[in-house]
Amino acid sequence: MGQEQGTPWILSTGHISTQKGEDGQKTPKLEHHNSTQLMGHYQKTMNQVVMPKQIVY
């Protein structure tokens, strides 16, 4: 199930990257920031998803 949730996240990031791609110059810098933020968000999402699952089990 974790992979399924990861798919929409990647799609969302792609859309954001496309919008910021218009700037061009800011694209590289934003991409680096996005990578770091994405990792943090992914870890937080995973923790939140894992916690309720454990409680249900």
UniProtKB/Swiss-Prot annotation:
Top-level taxon of the source organism: Viruses
GO BP terms: symbiont-mediated suppression of host cytoplasmic pattern recognition receptor signaling pathway via inhibition of MAVS activity
GO-annotated cellular components: host cell cytosol; host cell nucleus; membrane
Keyword Signal: no
Keywords, alphabetical: Host cytoplasm, Host nucleus
Region (Disordered) location: 1-30
Compositional bias segments (type: Basic and acidic residues): 20-30
Compartment(s) of residence: Host nucleus; Host cytoplasm, Host cytosol
Misc. comment: Is not encoded in all strains, and seems to be dispensable for replication.
Function of the molecule: May play an important role in promoting lung pathology in both primary viral infection and secondary bacterial infection.
Protein family (similarity comment): Belongs to the influenza viruses PB1-F2 family.
HAMAP family, per database record: INFV_PB1F2 (MF_04064)
Protein name as it appears in the record: Protein PB1-F2
Source organism of the structure: Influenza A virus (strain A/Malaysia:Malaya/302/1954 H1N1)
